[in-house]
Amino acid sequence: MRARNLMRLASVASVCSLIAACGSSAPADISAPTASVGAIPLLARASTRRLLDWPEFGLNPQRTDVSESATDITGANVAHLRRVQLKLAGTVDSSPIYLHDALVGGAAHNVIVLTTTYGKTLAIDADSSRTLWTFTPSGYQNWAGSAQITTVSPLADPDRRFVYAASPDGLIHKLSLAGGSEDSAGAWPVSITRDATHEKLGSALNIDGSDLIATTSGYFGDAPTYQGHVVLISRSSGKLQGVFNTLCANRRTIMVPSSCAQSDSAILSRGGAVVEPGGGRLLIDTGNAHWNGATDFGDSVLELAVPGLTLRQAFTPTDQETLNASDLDLGSSAPALLGEDRIVLAGKDGIMRVLALSRLSGRPPSSRETLGGEVQRLPAPGGGELFTAPAVWRRDGRTTMFVADENATAAYVMRRGRLYLAWENHTAGTSPVMAGGLLYVYEPSAGGIYVYHPGSPSPIAKLPGAPGHWNSPIVVDGHVVEPEGNANDHSLSGTLEIFSAG
């Protein structure tokens, strides 16, 4: 996860030549077979159901970022939404969440909840744009304005009474939705690192049954020592239910980072841990670090069993050493669940890898981890580095995936376990979302949200906005909500865009 290497390989082709030289058993070609846009299902109209809540990054624990339910925003009115810009007491370099008709301050509100890079969590009325409450973590003044930040998206408890949020001191907080007060019962708030100055809380929180899932990474520049790890936290008590360290994996507690001989292996993706359908298993992937297939898992995809967070199987590409040496983190984007026993991931090398979920390494799960085994490799959109989360739409037995990166936005369809490129344009984007039959992609360099019909690379509208970084929108209950700004600017202010129908 080191800062972008100025000597980075100039193109996907040059990376491909290095991979070919490795003599892998992986597919030899790196190409994008094509399909017509007609392969993308038609959605004549949104479901009669309305999408009222957006409780976490990716909408659900599987991080699909897709809902066919109606949002009250259509192709006919999307270019005419009412725009409100709010100045915030901090930058939100992540995504917000939303709850319809939530009880706050004794009254029902349609509530946006978001967390700034220095750990302030705010609840905002989506209709009036009024701030309902602000939670400021203890110690805020100690890191405000510094490089010690968080980019964690908050998560709403299914009971709608609490929200969970992170702060740069390594704590996960349980906050009352009614007023923003901190729940200190049991073990709350929960520390998930022994050194918050080196281990960053960067990826979105997730949930699996009674447990909250959180992960750690490193800061920009990769100052050692840190180890990416994932933790399970009881939502009720705050008790740690499990820990998996991606380095020194034989140690099952939260370590002092300097006590492990290896460093890095960040879990740095926007999506963090992805929960498989039905729960009980989750997927993570890691950034640059040492790999030995036993205790150290740099540049790998790991499937962990819940509740013990035991390693079930793993995938590591044959060119892992090259990725590590060249700062080409495999895990810059989380695994995306495609269905039909397939997942896909893409990293900073500009290559998407399709894996069989039942056999990540191409072999039955076992304690002996080996290199290689992907089903397919193809270029990321425009050959770009991928730091975003794909959106995956399954309809009528077909899978469509939307991906955006620093170079392009693209749509892929899956046939017989392989991905085919249906369309691509040259517009950069962060994590796409599809809601109510429309696709929304925030463009972080120039700002603004491009809106598409899923079957076309030509936008039907662009919502105005300012530049950002990893921010991505949500579209729910008649609103498009998009935070703006870059965490690496270390600013104490930011902007929130709210576009509303009616």
Positions of predicted regions on the chain:
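Bacterial signal peptide processing site
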Residues: 23-26
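General structural concept
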Residues: 94-100, 112-114
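Predominantly extracellular/luminal regions of secreted and cell-surface proteins
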Residues: 48-70
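C-terminal motif of bacterial Sec signal peptides marking the signal peptidase cleavage site
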Residues: 19-21
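Post-signal peptide N-terminal segment of mature Sec-exported envelope proteins
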Residues: 29-51
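Bacterial N-terminal signal peptides that target proteins for export
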Residues: 1-12
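Extracytoplasmic/lumenal domain signature
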Residues: 49-50, 68-91, 103-108, 119-147, ...
